[in-house]
Amino acid sequence: MCATLHISIFLSNLVCKTCKVLNQELMANIYSDRIEALRGLMARNGWDAVVISGSDPHASEYPAPRWQQVRWLTGFTGEAGDVVVTMNHAGLWTDSRYFIQAQTQLEGTGVELHKTRVPGEVPIPQWLSENARVVALDGLCWNVDAVKEIESAMSASLEEYREEGAPAYSVVDEPDMMDALWEDRPWTPVTPVTTLDVDCFGGTQRAEKISWLRKWMLLNDAEAVLLTSLDEIAWLLNVRGSDIEYNPLVISYLIVTQDYVKWFVKKPSFAGELDPDTADSFTELSEDGVDIEDYDAIYSGLADLGNECSGVFVDPSTLNHHIYNCICDTFPAESVVFGKSPVILEKSVKTESEIEHLRQTYVEDGVAVERFLHWLETEVATGRDVSEWEASERLTAFRAEILGYRGNSFENISAYGPGAALPHYSTPREGSAVIRPCGLYLVDSGGQYLTGTTDITRTVPMGPCTALEKEDYTLVLKGMIALSMAVFPRGTTGHHLDVLARMPLWRAKRNFGHGTGHGIGYYLCVHEGPQSIRWQYNPQPLLPGMVTSNEPGLYREGMHGIRHENIVLCREAGSSEFGDWLEFETLTCCHIDTSALLPELLSSDELAWLNAYNEHVYSTLAPLLPSDTALWLRDKTLPVES
């Protein structure tokens, strides 16, 4: 009987693997054909190279399907990646979060992986300067800074080889160039628009924000400001939508002068009538002096602006190259003022009402995650086969029970064993791994709520773990605790603090490639700036009110991945004769599993922090949990002895 069953399982797995291989080969051929079609377009237009951005006209991290051009062309599904195609080469440039994923997804497509932020690797601008003279790009999807880097590299290369008679270079702006190849390309999304009740859910009134921006404009001699980043516009106008998955944003542009505010946005309608939510929102906006214009009217709006103002302020890190070219058709180059948008910093410092809502939101989010972890451990312990996908869906279901839930803040990362070695593992609906009662399971997830945005990662021992898994688990946790305990002088940047999270790993000659921390929006994007905690230099100091992730990790290809992530609030920590001091308050409220911990590797201070944190989680969440989950959590949060 057992032998027959094993043979049946073996044959079933063999068939599944064969089908998977055949499907991969079929898709690889499709992507190869698309690249060849693009080369045909290049030949007809005399382009040496085409560069394709993984972003959209608003520099979004998560573009809507219409702008997922990298995915359509190559099959790569990571959130960060740009493609270069020449007549004899196709390459994808992405960072360490996606190296393993890219190697798998690009197999057979003819697209070569180029690693970014790795010593010795050539970035796109330099590569283009060495391999092309005429470069075409969709200017709608490349920001001004990125295009200037390409132009600068190509110009420098031209100067170097001028004596050899090298031809002049050119960067061709070809908006929506993929329309010629992508027959069923999606349209720009249009979803209902809602406004936020800040009296109920925290924040600052729209009129106050607009008044603040106008004061900033007066102080900085800016007659007009063009905002193109969707989260900045959503924050300033207190509007939300669902044009982009996981991000409550509305695709739009915004012009602000001392005389008017014009919002360029697509208007969702049915049978010629606005949907009720949008109609009410537009009425409210109009009452606050916001003029509603059609999205595509941005071009005429910029032309009108040229007749009304002598200059305009823009942020070249988010303004797309095509719109910039249109601005230059209206304004002299010296009248287009580049700078960092003031909205980015103002948005990152949460108000007292937002902070209070966030504290409660992280408690409610913690209840959902604890219920999920209890369910998962119980199911796996009873011998039931729970797949990564089922686990992910169950976690989402627990979150969906929370009042004010508006969806996930990003795609759940539900990864068991080797899958967790991919920092941004994409859990497949079909064929995802079964979670076994041994080793490590990593779950990185978050929710969008009217009262804030959450993000949390827990690495969970599902049963017996190897000595290496335990050591890695403990070293990563030491780094997270070190950063959590940090006290630092005002003016400190995340660049200064990053080493705290890495030092325990570095001492063991281990490391991780991604950043340690990113800013988090308030019912906005789960990734925001200007602050960050990473080894790359960022001049932005951490300020009281900023909410940032604390998430060191460690990844061993083919074995396991570990990441511990809490969200921390920067707050004041008093003063001394040496100045003003800051510290972190941990907002995340979910226990840290200690069953894979090596206590002897933790200092007494680290153990004290861990025990105090777990006790806080238990005392806060136990009254809100079902009785069986509360009993389970009591066992999970018992103090660890050294």
How would you name each of these model-derived features?
Residues M1, V15-T18:
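The N-terminal extracellular segments of secreted preproproteins, especially immediately downstream
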Residues F10, K17-S642:
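Active-site neighborhoods and metal-handling regions in enzymes and metal-associated proteins
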